[in-house]
From Swiss-Prot:
Superkingdom as given in the UniProt entry: Bacteria
Signal sequence region: none
A Pfam family: PMT
Catalytic activity: 4-amino-4-deoxy-alpha-L-arabinopyranosyl di-trans,octa-cis-undecaprenyl phosphate + lipid IVA = lipid IIA + di-trans,octa-cis-undecaprenyl phosphate
GO MF terms held by the record: 4-amino-4-deoxy-L-arabinose transferase activity; mannosyltransferase activity
GO CC terms, sorted: plasma membrane
Name by which UniProt lists this protein: Undecaprenyl phosphate-alpha-4-amino-4-deoxy-L-arabinose arabinosyl transferase
EC number: 2.4.2.43
Cellular localisation: Cell inner membrane
BP terms from Gene Ontology: lipid A biosynthetic process; lipopolysaccharide biosynthetic process; protein O-linked glycosylation; response to iron(III) ion
Biological function: Catalyzes the transfer of the L-Ara4N moiety of the glycolipid undecaprenyl phosphate-alpha-L-Ara4N to lipid A. The modified arabinose is attached to lipid A and is required for resistance to polymyxin and cationic antimicrobial peptides.
Disulfide bonds listed in the record: none
The organism's taxonomic lineage, starting at the top: Bacteria, Pseudomonadati, Pseudomonadota, Gammaproteobacteria, Enterobacterales
Pathway terms, separated by semicolons: Lipopolysaccharide metabolism; 4-amino-4-deoxy-beta-L-arabinose-lipid A biosynthesis
């Protein structure tokens, strides 16, 4: 009976994973700038056959190392030129992280129910789901940080020198791959997480003795590529270390500057549909640090990165994704250890929180659709889009309501709360947002004109990357704004990849002699103010914030 229930729960989790993570993956447009950027970088890597130096729009792009791109490359190589392939590496990394969470729970507590619950909490947490189905590098670096956490547990449990060497070697492999995915950050997070555990358990000597092995392994793993990219591009490491790391995280003008408390609401919303478990799980990690040292270890791996990112001036909500694997383990362990009556009461509180959360969001979408708030977000004729958005959260409410049934196992049905959101969100985005963040629709609507253009320009890197991806050509020229390609455009061989607004009329007059020209703009407002002073086009196509100016070839 017990084995049968475990098999049933495992099957349900696999089906839920497929419905949440795989089925909707190809049905959503790529978001700009992140998804269009990573899609195009890997497309160009495959096209060029260059897996060493990343390029975007044929311009050097030094913002990240290459391991994340490699996973994206493999996905596109195996699965083709689709939105599914663009996002699959993120989903694959999230699935492997969930497997590590499952195995780690089994290792720590020898209980398959707790292990399944930990994996379920991880996969269905709102922030994990949102980032895990989105093409960015954070799910991949999270995979390696979860592997580093797993290695740390192996280190703690090792009794023989050989076991310690193996565990520290695995830590080095995980850190090395993390470094090759997102840089020095992947070395800092394990250090700040391991150190308080070593101090609390008086194992500093062991850390100093065996820790260098992890460093050596990480260096050996990353050295071939690090040396190869240096040989090809001598200033890669200067840019990557000083600009990408020091300026982004520490300086006053850091990119994505945000206050210290920024991650508190992100954490609260991101843990839905399991929010009620958060306070007790964190408290137990500290309160039971002596009786259950593994919980203190998990607490350190959750809290220390969170503090690190909170102190850093540059912040993005994706940064704290590595905190969710240890948090899911803490939650599963804590609720599994409660007395049945207390557990049932907690699950009911959790269900009510989800009921309130879903209701508020359903009402918010309805208010947006009716124009009560932000009256210009939805346009006339978008009734189905509004209904779809409301149903996303009505589904959340429905699962929360069903989970309120007075039966011990029903409380866990909140795991299904994100299901309707996952399946319907692609059809719930208002056209005004699609035509500012999802360039694929606009590009496909005017693909014949764009494909008939010898020269294609864009005033935003994310939009330009979307054009390159859809048209399968990397020679998109940037117009007026350099954006994140500013550094790469300073190279002499990239001088012709940017056209200033003042120089555009003369540039256009010259280029029109050899072919059609298409200029695609993303304007700030739904007016002609930003392009009225440009040379008059032969055709003008506009949809909300996207504008296409088409100039026909003229006789020489």
């Amino acid at each position: 009976m017990e084995k049968g229930m475990i098999k049933l729960k495992s099957t349900v989790i696999l089906v839920l994973f497929a419905l949440l993570y795989l089925l909707p993956l190809n049905g959503r447009w790529l978001w700009s700038p992140d998804e269009t950027r990573y899609a195009e970088i890997s497309r160009e890597m495959l096209q060029r056959g260059d897996w060493i130096v990343p390029h975007l729009l044929d311009v050097r792009y030094f913002e990240k190392p290459v391991a994340g791109y490699w996973l994206n490359n493999i996905s596109q190589w195996l699965l083709g030129h689709t939105n599914f392939s663009v996002r699959f590496a993120s989903v694959f990394s999230t699935a492997l992280s969930a497997l590590l969470v499952f195995w780690l729970a089994l290792l720590l507590w020898k209980n398959r129910r707790t292990a399944l619950l930990a994996a379920t909490i991880y996969l269905t947490s709102l922030l994990v789901y949102g980032i895990g189905t989105y093409s960015v590098l954070d799910p991949m670096v999270t995979l390696w940080m979860t592997a580093a956490l797993f290695s740390h547990v192996l280190i703690q449990r090792a009794t023989l020198t050989r076991e310690r060497l193996m565990a520290w070697g695995l830590m080095g492999l995980a850190c090395g791959m993390g470094f090759m995915t997102k840089g020095f950050l992947a070395l800092a997070l394990p250090v700040i997480s391991v150190l308080p555990v070593a101090l609390a358990q008086k194992r500093i000597k062991e850390l100093l003795l065996f820790g260098p092995l992890a460093i050596v392994v990480a260096v050996l793993l990353s050295a071939p590529w690090a040396l190869a990219v240096h040989a090809r591009e001598a200033d890669y490491w200067h840019y990557f270390f000083w600009i990408e790391h020091i300026q982004r995280f520490a300086e006053d003008d850091a990119q994505h500057n945000a206050p210290f408390w920024y991650y508190l609401p992100v954490l609260i919303v991101g843990t839905f549909p399991w929010l009620a478990l958060l306070p007790g799980a964190l408290r137990s990690g500290w309160a039971e640090r002596k009786s259950s040292p593994e919980r203190f270890l998990l607490l350190c791996w959750m809290v220390m990165p969170l503090l690190f990112f909170s102190i850093a001036k540059g912040k993005l909500l994706t940064y704290i994704l590595p905190c969710f694997a240890p948090l899911a383990l803490l939650m599963a362990a804590w609720i599994s250890g409660l007395a049945p009556a207390v557990r049932d009461r907690l699950l009911r509180i959790n269900s009510w929180l989800n009921l309130a959360f879903g209701s508020v969001l359903a009402l918010a979408v309805a208010a947006l659709g009716l124009g009560i708030i932000m009256p210009h977000l939805y346009q006339p004729g978008e009734g189905l889009t509004i209904v779809s958005g409301v149903v996303c959260f009505v589904g959340w409410v429905a699962f929360a309501a069903v989970s309120l049934k007075k039966s011990r196992s029903w409380g866990y049905l909140v795991a299904g709360c994100p299901l309707f959101l996952a399946l319907l969100v692609g059809g719930s985005i208002p056209a005004s947002v699609v035509d500012s963040k999802n360039p694929q629709t606009f590009i496909r609507s005017h693909q014949p004109l764009l494909e008939d253009s010898r020269y294609v320009l864009s005033d935003e890197v994310g939009l330009a990357a979307g054009l390159a991806w859809e048209l399968k050509r990397s020679d998109i020229t940037l117009f007026k704004a350099r954006g994140e390609l500013n550094y790469g455009l300073n190279y002499a061989d990239a001088a012709d990849r940017f056209v200033d607004e003042g120089a555009f009329p003369a540039w256009l007059a010259e280029k029109r002699r050899s072919g059609n020209v298409a200029l695609v703009l993303k304007i700030d407002r739904d007016t002609d103010e930003e392009y009225r002073n440009l040379p008059a086009p032969d055709q003008l196509k506009k949809s909300h914030r996207y504008v296409l100016l088409f100039y026909k070839q003229i006789a020489p």
